[in-house]
Amino acid sequence: MAIEVIDNFLDKDEFNKIQSCMISNNFPWFYSDYVSHEDEKNKFYFTHSFYKDLKPQSVFFTMLDNLLNKLEIKSLIRVKGNLHTKSNKIKYNNFHTDFSYKHKGCILYINDNNGFTYFKESDKKV
């Protein structure tokens, strides 16, 4: 699995528009009991589904138009926002694969924090 990190992928105005919306009090986040596997205990987070099942799921989907166009996507599968709450220590979640078939993924970090995404196959922290 090749991992490419592109700092400042979006211009500052575009990024600020998305960030301001997603961290506002008016942006809806939905509770999820588990992060990667249903049998996980005490590992919750919040999600927002922008796109799933071949159609937009959110009125906020169009906010991501410039980002998605810049990615030059062949076929869109899912667009989802994840929100993990603040913690005094780093919490590790179970490894998982989003889909069982060949695909590419994209992660856009909305804020700087002391956390990271760890990729097992490449032993890389991003």
Locate predicted features.
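Non-heme Fe(II)/2-oxoglutarate
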Residues: 1-74
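Catalytic core of non-heme Fe(II) oxygenases with the double-stranded beta-helix
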Residues: 51-126
